[in-house]
Amino acid sequence: MPMRRRVLAAGVAGLFGAFATGRTAQAVENTENAEAAVPPVRLDLLNLVNLSHVNDPATTNVFPGDPAFTLETIATIPENGYYLQFVREGEHTGTHWGAPGHFNTGQPLADEMDPADLFLPAVKIDIRAKAARNADYAVTIDDLKAWERKHGRIPNDSMVILWTGWDAKWGTPAFPNLDADNRIHQPGFSIPAVKWLIDTGRLGRRGGTGTDTFSPDVGTDETYTVSQLVYQRHRISLEILANLRALPTTGAWVLAGGPIHRHGSGSTATIFGVLPPGVRA
């Protein structure tokens, strides 16, 4: 194997190895010694799982006030020799990620983010039972500590993902769960829980929150305080995630992609869970 490919393979192995042993990716700092520190990993053995919904004008749930999602066929193979659709959507339509400038003036926007900001170790916190009993449930510090007693400490700079069960409601009125006053009822993080994640470094310069709902905020909280806290430095939020059953509780990474617009607030996205060999949901 050429040296460049060996170092790449060793570096990727170091990332996964560091996470699996409770160390952050920053622990593997010396790329010249990475190959000696960890064995190479075959990239073709990584397993990818899709965490994105398919957008369809007939079913895509849109946050109240956001532009409607539309598709228009503007070229066909019989008439034009190729097939093409015109897409109209907001930057946060369907599965997407948000940049810090989405909620905080002066913080990085989508075209100012680093590639590493979009590739993060992930933990999944299953709150489906609590969310089923209370659609406005807010995850507490005690919830996070209880999760850690069972699964180990959340690594620094992680993507902390809530599995609320709302991914199964996608495409139906039960997803926004609006009341008579047009208020959203969806679970999320409490403000103290997010402050604790930040104060303890679990959300650091990088990292963020993920959810299968519209937002990390509880739907009834129109102050967006949780989002304002998360969206700082180079932290992001992954929202309207799909297929979270296929994402392991620990041991996986998430990779977010999508078009980058000038001064973008984020991007519609194809988001993958990246599972190293031996890691299963």
Q: Where do the language-model regions lie?
A:
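Active-/binding-site microenvironments in catalytic and ligand-binding cores
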Residues: 2-3, 9-22, 28-281
